[in-house]
């Protein structure tokens, strides 16, 4: 065990000395609402630094380490520059069309952008908005961008830096497309904002993506898309442009995950092994679902 780096052991994984010290007493499962029978909005944890929560020092240490890694610096710079740039002004004259027509145009525009491989639309459910945030946009457009699988699989050989870089690149390319799509909507005379990148946001993206037909939740607690599998990153656009919603899809993820144990086999900390099988479809804020095992 090192000061900053953990080690694999015969029993799984031992976190670094610093992370063991910073680990809060309040379990992430408790914050996430495991076992709660009442419906409520989720509470933000990772990558949120605008309010205090038990995991803020843990998450901040992770981000600081990444910022001071030379290979990561340019990606943080790019993220900051995009956020500073903001969005164009909303056109004073609105272009009118039927919701179904707008939905078709939005998808065509999104898929024409280099940072979008899949796109779906859902009406915003207020329960997706984190409890520290407020947002009144009616619609969310979720876009997904595939990651470079050949690079990402280096993570299985513990070549983590290469994998981290492709994750950052994909997040930011997806964010760029979300910003461009938001600007296009604003040019039509409607409010819109793009959100993305490796940081926290006001919307819980996964339930929105499920409602938008992007994919289904796998037992590894991440989204599975029919074309991209789990190997993609998402960003989204919140807007008041009148749209038509997509529907959730059934692509057989539950059946597939019932026979595949790869995420268990290749998880060094054995977190998936602790979660899968024993923690499927438990009550989380009144909803019965799969969930992360978050000690």
Indicate where each model-derived feature is located:
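Iron-sulfur (Fe-S) cluster-binding modules
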Residues: 1-123, 135-136
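Catalytic cores of enzyme domains
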Residues: 100, 107, 112, 117-295
